Amino acid sequence: MIALIQRVSRASVVVDNQTIGAIDKGLLVLLGVEREDNREKMEKLATKVMSYRVFSDENGKMNLNLTQAGGSLLVVSQFTLAADTGRGLRPSFSGAGTPEQALGLYEEFVAFCRAQGVTTETGQFGADMKVELVNDGPVTFNLQV
């Protein structure tokens, strides 16, 4: 399971010219599901995302996690993160989870984060989305479990 996280000062997702999810300070999470992923990996990754210290403390050091910084999550499904780009000039998605598997783990990821008390907005699984963000830093990390 893969989460490309970006520290943002604001981010939003638009589907059919309608904003369906938006946050101010927090993390934009692009979430990719691979075939071997399961609930255990999902919980481990969600915990890591929420606990990862990417926000600056009073000394300007990246030392605060999402909750400590008072941030929110915007979680967007992103199957292309599971692409194999090692050969040729076209990505292979043979390692990506099935749509059913990915939808289930995506929904569980969101529910798990919300259950921890984190304000969590979402995109729309499988939709053509327009994601707008202001990357703060920029700060971007690729987390995998």
Swiss-Prot record:
It comes from the Bacteria. GO terms for cellular component: cytoplasm. Its EC number is 3.1.1.96. CDD domains: Dtyr_deacylase (cd00563). InterPro entries: Daa-tRNA_deacyls_DTD (IPR003732), DTD-like_sf (IPR023509). A motif (Gly-cisPro motif, important for rejection of L-amino acids) lies at residues 137-138. It is found in: Cytoplasm. It catalyses: glycyl-tRNA(Ala) + H2O = tRNA(Ala) + glycine + H(+); a D-aminoacyl-tRNA + H2O = a tRNA + a D-alpha-amino acid + H(+). One of its GO terms (biological process) is D-amino acid catabolic process. The keyword Hydrolase applies. Belongs to the DTD family. NCBIfam families: D-aminoacyl-tRNA deacylase. An aminoacyl-tRNA editing enzyme that deacylates mischarged D-aminoacyl-tRNAs. Also deacylates mischarged glycyl-tRNA(Ala), protecting cells against glycine mischarging by AlaRS. Acts via tRNA-based rather than protein-based catalysis; rejects L-amino acids rather than detecting D-amino acids in the active site. By recycling D-aminoacyl-tRNA to D-amino acids and free tRNA molecules, this enzyme counteracts the toxicity associated with the formation of D-aminoacyl-tRNA entities in vivo and helps enforce protein L-homochirality. A Gly-cisPro motif from one monomer fits into the active site of the other monomer to allow specific chiral rejection of L-amino acids. Homodimer. This is D-aminoacyl-tRNA deacylase. It comes from Shewanella sp. (strain MR-4). The lineage of its organism: Bacteria, Pseudomonadati, Pseudomonadota, Gammaproteobacteria, Alteromonadales. The gene is dtd.
